[in-house]
């Protein structure tokens, strides 16, 4: 009972001079939490004494923890370029500077400077994408799942959409194509078998209620062996014959020729635009290497109907997304791929990666065991399943730490590596030159040098 009576009152405790600079409302909340925790521990006989100085330190530490941003900078040393858990594609610092003046000022987001009246936010991006892809019109929403939902809700609500059974994918986070379709109001008609679907499967499934033939890219898995699927150009032709909409959910998609034979595994937006499709959609933050966005391209008449759907108000993107996306598309249009970090990392040769690895090795070789290795990695982001690309890594061992301990120590410093063959690796496919000295500093900290 004595300890309970010794717990200070909140209103008196917060007058401590060490709290002078703290905002009162937050200070009161934190103090109440610290004192409540103290009270509970006393009742559980977990402590025998405490001091006011200890409580002050706990309050200050909790304040520091609460006000520290949860979203932090990470050095990605996993080698996975489009790392879903680490923010997918990076935005180039120079690109961010180019759009900084736009997003920190009033701008013409929905204002027509020539006519002096209300304009359309999508007009800023449409010209660049139309020139790049040769499409009639463009619409941008907040991600590709939104694009799928909006398209289905607009053109197939209470109608049938024919899809191959082998393409009913789960795109991550338990979001499944059939569930998205159901929520949109569309009725799924699945055809074919898991491993084989033929054009006649689509033909036989078409009824008076059918509005769309849909193809979904199997971005995060592959079917090999005794398998076949219908080419999108065949679906486009069939859709025209039956007066239906053809739509390809391309997932990642890509706008440039990819290295390491990756073109064989990922659909090219440019290639499929040659079929003059009704609609295509793909992600902005995967192989395009830009911001999170769902990019819908296709015929003007269909894009116009999508723009009239009231759901678009909930799915639209803001000025920062549009400004950065426009910058990325212009970089691709001008073939300035070095301005897009995702593509720069993807196209980097192993010779370049080895040069960077040797710089770090030279900086830390006197304080730890480190070896430059040839390895392989994946692109990530649900792209090119089962396809590995060459990379260079630095295997590091400090003192007698096991690889799991090494991974934990580096992770505590916001450097995420990977464990391979019982060794802790830093993969240079995703490490930038500007990060090498920072990594070297962390190695010295861990080694207590």
Swiss-Prot record:
Pathway: Aminoacyl-tRNA biosynthesis; selenocysteinyl-tRNA(Sec) biosynthesis; selenocysteinyl-tRNA(Sec) from L-seryl-tRNA(Sec) (bacterial route): step 1/1. Belongs to the SelA family. Coiled coil: none annotated. This is L-seryl-tRNA(Sec) selenium transferase. It comes from Sulfurimonas denitrificans (strain ATCC 33889 / DSM 1251). The modification N6-(pyridoxal phosphate)lysine is found at residue 286. InterPro entries: PyrdxlP-dep_Trfase, PyrdxlP-dep_Trfase_major, SelA-like, SelA_trans. Converts seryl-tRNA(Sec) to selenocysteinyl-tRNA(Sec) required for selenoprotein biosynthesis. GO terms for biological process: conversion of seryl-tRNAsec to selenocys-tRNAsec; selenocysteine incorporation. The keyword DNA repair does not apply. It is found in: Cytoplasm. GO terms for molecular function: L-seryl-tRNA(Sec) selenium transferase activity. Its EC number is 2.9.1.1. It is an enzyme of class 2 (transferase). Its main location: cytoplasm. Keywords: Cytoplasm, Protein biosynthesis, Pyridoxal phosphate, Selenium, Transferase. Its cofactor is pyridoxal 5'-phosphate. It catalyses: L-seryl-tRNA(Sec) + selenophosphate + H(+) = L-selenocysteinyl-tRNA(Sec) + phosphate. One of its GO terms (cellular component) is cytoplasm. It comes from the Bacteria. The gene is selA.
């Amino acid at each position: 009972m004595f300890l309970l009576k010794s717990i200070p009152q909140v209103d008196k405790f917060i007058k401590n001079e060490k709290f002078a600079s703290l905002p009162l409302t937050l200070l009161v909340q934190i103090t109440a939490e610290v004192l409540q925790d103290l009270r509970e521990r006393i009742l559980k006989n977990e402590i025998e004494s405490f001091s006011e100085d200890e409580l002050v330190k706990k309050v200050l530490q909790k304040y520091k923890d609460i006000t520290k941003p949860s979203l932090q900078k990470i050095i990605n040393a996993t080698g996975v370029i489009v790392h879903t858990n680490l923010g997918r594609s990076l935005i180039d610092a120079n690109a961010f500077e180019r759009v900084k003046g736009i997003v920190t000022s009033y701008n013409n987001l929905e204002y027509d400077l020539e006519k002096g009246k209300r304009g359309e936010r999508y007009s800023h991006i449409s010209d660049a994408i139309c020139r790049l892809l040769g499409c009639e019109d463009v619409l941008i929403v907040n991600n590709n799942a939104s694009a799928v939902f909006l398209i289905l809700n607009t053109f197939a609500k209470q109608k049938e959409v024919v899809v191959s059974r082998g393409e009913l994918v789960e795109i991550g986070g338990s979001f499944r194509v059939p569930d998205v379709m159901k929520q949109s109001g569309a009725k799924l008609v699945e055809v074919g078998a898991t491993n084989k679907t033929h054009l006649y499967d689509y033909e036989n499934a078409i009824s008076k209620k059918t509005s769309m033939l849909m193809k979904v890219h199997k971005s995060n898995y592959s079917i090999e062996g005794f398998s076949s699927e219908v080419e999108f150009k065949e679906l486009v032709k069939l859709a025209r014959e039956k007066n239906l909409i053809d739509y390809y959910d391309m997932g990642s998609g890509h706008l440039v020729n990819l290295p390491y034979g990756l073109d064989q595994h990922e659909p090219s937006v440019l290639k499929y635009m040659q079929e003059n499709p009704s609609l295509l959609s793909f992600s902005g933050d995967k192989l395009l290497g830009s911001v999170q966005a769902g990019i819908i391209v296709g015929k003007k008449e269909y894009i116009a109907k999508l723009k009239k759907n009231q759901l678009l108000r909930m799915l639209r993107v803001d000025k920062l997304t549009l400004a950065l996306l426009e910058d990325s598309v212009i970089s691709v249009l001008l073939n300035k791929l070095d301005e897009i970090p995702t593509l720069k990392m993807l196209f980097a040769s192993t010779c370049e990666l080895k040069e960077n690895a040797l710089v770090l090795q030279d900086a830390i070789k006197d304080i730890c065991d480190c070896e430059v290795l040839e390895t392989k990695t994946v692109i990530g982001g649900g792209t090119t399943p089962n396809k590995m690309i060459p990379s260079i890594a630095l295997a590091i061992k400090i003192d007698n730490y096991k690889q799991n301990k090494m991974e934990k120590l580096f992770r505590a410093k916001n450097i995420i590596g990977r464990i391979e063959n019982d060794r802790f690796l830093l993969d240079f496919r995703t490490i930038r030159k500007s990060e090498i000295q920072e990594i070297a500093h962390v190695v010295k900290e861990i080694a207590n040098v």
